[in-house]
């Protein structure tokens, strides 16, 4: 008789090799005041500098605005743009007063063109007010482990106020979380979007054209924050997120770092999200589970699943072609 075991696993339960756990600050090619590269599955730091330094992050905070809108399950609602939306300064999608747009349209305008008018319209519709929406932003930040983040608005403002404060690490955590949302992933990776009655919006994220494995990203800039950029990429099963704060050549830096780590590491998947048929058992996992291995050990290995006599999954093991055994213990 087949059995179903439900495995409750946190992001931190993913096993990785020891040589991926050191923070390497030796990169001298690019300048970034703060940067971090993390494994999106377990949020482990692969490399970084000033990763927990709190500072203004500009428009990359709109990733949070977008994910809250998408998680409201109201993306096909049609919204009448308020008058105040037309008065927002900075980047805009040029909404007219009383113009009707879907929440989905607004999310595209927010992510591709960084529209502050889109951010205002989203925030007042979903939150009832800017303050109400900001509470949702900070609540979500706390929920997903952004320990050094405080949002004060739905867009980027840091001219006459403190602005949205966060860290490179926290923003990479946010991008890792957001990219698990199907709609966010689709929007963030879209290079152009035609909004009826308004315009065709071209994505400001140049990394989409520069690097084929890019999953998406968000740019930002203010005089206080300087250039900010958060992105994600996937290759050989390995999902990585990167954030740079005050980096002048950020697109090139992100591409360089992705190429660096994808040339060294790969991901071996043992369990996918949902039901997995393993031998005579069905295993349900809340997350995808696996291990990160050096790229040279990515192929020709063997995956083993160890069950107890009663059919309980005890651990999983990967045996490389040179005999190294790497175990994933589920119940530590």
Short names for language-model regions:
Residues 12-13, 56, 303, 311:
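A general, composition-driven signal for non-globular sequence regions
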Residues 17-180:
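Active-site-adjacent loops and short helices of periplasmic peptidoglycan-processing enzymes
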Residues 6-7, 66, 316:
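Short amphipathic alpha-helical "recognition" segments used for binding
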């Amino acid at each position: 008789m087949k059995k179903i075991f439900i495995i409750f696993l946190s992001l931190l339960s993913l096993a990785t090799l020891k040589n991926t756990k050191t923070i390497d600050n030796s990169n001298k090619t690019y300048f970034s005041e703060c940067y971090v590269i993390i494994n999106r599955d377990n949020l482990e730091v692969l490399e970084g500098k000033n990763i927990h330094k709190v500072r203004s992050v500009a428009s990359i905070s709109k990733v949070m605005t977008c994910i809250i809108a998408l998680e409201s399950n109201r993306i096909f609602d049609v919204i009448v743009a308020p008058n105040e939306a037309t008065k927002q300064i900075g980047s805009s999608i040029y909404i007219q007063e009383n113009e009707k747009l879907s929440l989905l349209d607004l999310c595209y305008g927010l992510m591709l063109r960084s529209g502050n008018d889109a951010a205002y319209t989203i925030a007042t519709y979903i939150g009832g007010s800017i303050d109400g929406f900001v509470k949702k932003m900070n609540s979500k930040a706390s929920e997903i482990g952004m320990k050094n983040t405080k949002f004060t608005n739905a867009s980027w403002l840091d001219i006459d106020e403190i602005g949205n404060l966060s860290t490179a690490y926290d923003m990479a955590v946010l991008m890792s979380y957001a990219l698990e949302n199907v709609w966010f992933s689709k929007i963030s990776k879209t290079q152009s979007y035609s909004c009826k009655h308004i315009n065709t919006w071209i994505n400001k994220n140049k990394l989409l054209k520069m690097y084929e494995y890019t999953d998406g990203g968000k740019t930002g800039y203010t005089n206080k924050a300087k250039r900010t950029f958060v992105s994600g990429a996937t290759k050989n099963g390995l999902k990585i997120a990167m954030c740079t704060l005050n980096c002048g050549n950020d697109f090139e830096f992100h591409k360089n770092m992705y190429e660096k780590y994808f040339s060294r590491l790969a991901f071996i998947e043992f369990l996918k999200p949902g039901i997995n048929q393993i031998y005579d058992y069905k295993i349900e996992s809340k997350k995808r589970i696996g291990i990160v291995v050096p790229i040279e050990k990515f192929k020709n290995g063997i995956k083993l699943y160890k069950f107890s006599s009663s059919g309980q999954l005890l651990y999983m093991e990967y045996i490389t072609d040179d005999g190294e055994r790497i175990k994933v213990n589920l119940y530590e």
